[in-house]
């Protein structure tokens, strides 16, 4: 009978915990030791390790689990991904580590969902090799350039918030995008988004946007424009699919375009000269002040939510 030889104590512990609950017959006790039969490795399809004791070299043990489909690794002591084996069935990957080179991820060719959060990613190139990706989340990193991302033609969901991005031109070549998160960058030009006809949700909170004309022919349902430099909302009037709109903290000079958008179900604004006309002329809109609470992201006392009456 063959047993698994572990090098990583953490991975060994995770495997034994799983098998003890569901496949205890694959654990064999010899004296004070508990051994894992080799066939037990084939039953591991998901592994989640959130522990700073996990080291870079521990990743080599993952080669014994060829059926892993989902992997989550959170550790400040993973600084190198070179030991990550080519997991041929891996489809979902979440990393919160301190690596500097993400090139080893290209060994996992079947990845469909990848999230690398707050991990110092400065080069998007390795992710552009993962052409089967449908969801890519690179929030809170150090990205400046998006060049190469146009190769990811299957992407439907993309998170790039809290980076250092100014130019989004490569996004023009991602026709299947439905959800785009670009909060807290330095983006001013939205023209590359004109071609994204499948885009439903767009989040642009805390950027440098002034011109909304590139959005006028899209079919957006949810749009977050808070904390930009927007003065004119008239380009939004023709987006009849739009239901949720956030426009707080913009120097908006004229609220009248909103009165031509009766299809809106939710509007967030901080300006009295905007919410009063809405309240007066659109009877289906109800106003509620927000002081945190139900909407904890809104801390300012002069923020108002408008939502469609039942």
Residue locations for each model-derived region?
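Short glycine-/acidic-enriched loop or helix-start segments at secondary-structure transitions
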Residues: 257, 278-279
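Concave beta-strand-loop units of leucine-rich repeat
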Residues: 43-57, 61-79, 83, 89-104, ...
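Short intrinsically disordered terminal tails
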Residues: 1, 309-310
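Extreme N-terminus of proteins, especially the signal/transit-peptide cleavage junction
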Residues: 1-2, 95
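LRR flanking "cap" motifs
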Residues: 2-64, 296-303
């Amino acid at each position: 009978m063959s047993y698994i030889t572990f090098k990583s104590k953490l991975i060994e512990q995770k495997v034994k915990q799983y098998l003890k609950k569901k496949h205890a017959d694959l654990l064999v006790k010899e004296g004070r030791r508990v051994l894992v039969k080799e066939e037990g490795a084939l039953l591991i399809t998901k592994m989640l390790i959130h522990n700073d004791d996990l080291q870079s070299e521990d990743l080599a043990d993952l080669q014994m689990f060829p059926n892993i489909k989902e992997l989550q690794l959170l550790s400040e002591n993973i600084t190198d991904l070179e030991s990550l084996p080519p997991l041929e069935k891996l489809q979902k990957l979440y990393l919160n580590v301190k690596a500097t080179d993400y090139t080893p991820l290209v060994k996992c060719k079947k990845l469909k969902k990848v999230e690398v959060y707050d991990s110092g990613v400065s080069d998007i190139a390795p992710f552009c090799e993962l052409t089967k990706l449908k969801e890519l989340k690179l929030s809170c990193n150090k990205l400046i350039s998006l060049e190469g991302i146009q190769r990811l033609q299957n992407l439907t969901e993309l998170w790039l918030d809290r980076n250092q991005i100014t130019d989004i031109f490569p996004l023009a070549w991602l026709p299947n995008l439905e959800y785009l998160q670009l909060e807290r960058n330095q983006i001013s030009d939205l023209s590359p988004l004109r071609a994204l006809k499948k885009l439903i949700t767009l989040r642009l909170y805390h950027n440098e946007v002034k011109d909304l004309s590139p959005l006028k022919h899209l079919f957006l349902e949810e749009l977050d424009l808070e904390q930009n430099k927007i003065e004119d909302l008239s380009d939004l009037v023709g987006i009849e699919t739009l239901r949720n709109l956030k426009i707080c903290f913009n120097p908006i000079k004229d609220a009248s375009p909103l009165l031509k958008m009766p299809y809106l179900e939710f509007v967030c604004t901080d300006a009295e000269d905007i919410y009063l006309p809405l309240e007066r002329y659109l009877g289906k809109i109800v106003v509620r002040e927000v002081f945190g609470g139900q909407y904890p992201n809104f801390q300012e006392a002069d923020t108002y939510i408008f939502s469609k009456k039942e």
